[in-house]
Amino acid sequence: MMRYALGVEYDGSEFLGWQQLGEMGPSVQATLQQALASVADSSVRVVCAGRTDAGVHGQCQVVHFDSAVTRPPRAWILGTTTRLPSSVAVRWCVPTSEDFHARFSACARRYRYRLLNRQVRPALQHQFLSWERHPLDAQAMHVAAQMLLGENDFSAFRSAQCQALHARRELQAISVRRDAEVIEICVQANAFLHHMVRNIVGSLLMVGTGERPMEWIAELLAGRDRTMAGPTASARGLVFVGPLYPEKWHLPMEVSV
């Protein structure tokens, strides 16, 4: 058996999320597995670096799969992509060792959240942009966000459905910046809780509108109470930029936050 690593890009708008959930609806995982199985002429199961929710996009999701069939990387890339809908594409393929694991070999994961901050909702690229009509203070949001850095208990920002055994995560980097009418929030951590990024964004938006002071974010973190934090931000503005791996795996992780 040969193990392969793939870099996958997808528009999550029409999917119920990454994970295959029986017959409930289309998932990125099931769609990719079906295309790979056609190339391999046998069933294929993929394991991803990080599962995304319904409506969340993937810029460079990394997966691994095992196959008894030997194909050159180009054949896996082109053969699979031609069998995928236009909303999913394989960016690269690297043969790797059986020690590599898309999830457990990753040392960090990165997300990007983008929203349009103007009076009128977006018509172009609306599936990739959230929207906030009230003026936002991006600098205040950025300063408040720095209070989340480090290893902390992020219970205030996890969903009620989160199945993680504990809420401690290491937030390694977070930034909020404005480019004209678009505000971009970039986050990197060793791992994330369910809805963690969207819940952080929802709370930062309340700081941005002036509803809450910057210090409120630190109070939420210390309080560990989800009911005291802001609402969960829309999924449509969220992109899983991708995972980071140690250099020994030689994966083409050229995507930067």
UniProtKB/Swiss-Prot annotation:
The protein's name in its UniProt record: tRNA pseudouridine synthase A
Subunit structure, as described in the record: Homodimer.
Pfam families xrefs: PseudoU_synth_1
Ligand binding (substrate): Y111
InterPro entries assigned: PsdUridine_synth_cat_dom_sf, PsdUridine_synth_TruA, PsdUridine_synth_TruA_a/b_dom, PsdUridine_synth_TruA_C, TruA/RsuA/RluB/E/F_N
Catalytic activity: uridine(38/39/40) in tRNA = pseudouridine(38/39/40) in tRNA
Physiological role: Formation of pseudouridine at positions 38, 39 and 40 in the anticodon stem and loop of transfer RNAs.
SUPFAM superfamilies assigned to the protein according to its UniProt record, in alphabetical order: Pseudouridine synthase
Entries under CDD domains matching the protein: PseudoU_synth_EcTruA
GO biological process: tRNA pseudouridine synthesis
Keywords assigned: Isomerase, tRNA processing
Family: Belongs to the tRNA pseudouridine synthase TruA family.
Class in the EC hierarchy, top level: isomerase
Originating species: Xylella fastidiosa (strain Temecula1 / ATCC 700964)
A molecular function GO annotation: tRNA pseudouridine(38-40) synthase activity
Active site residues per record: D53 (nucleophile)
EC code(s) of this entry: 5.4.99.12
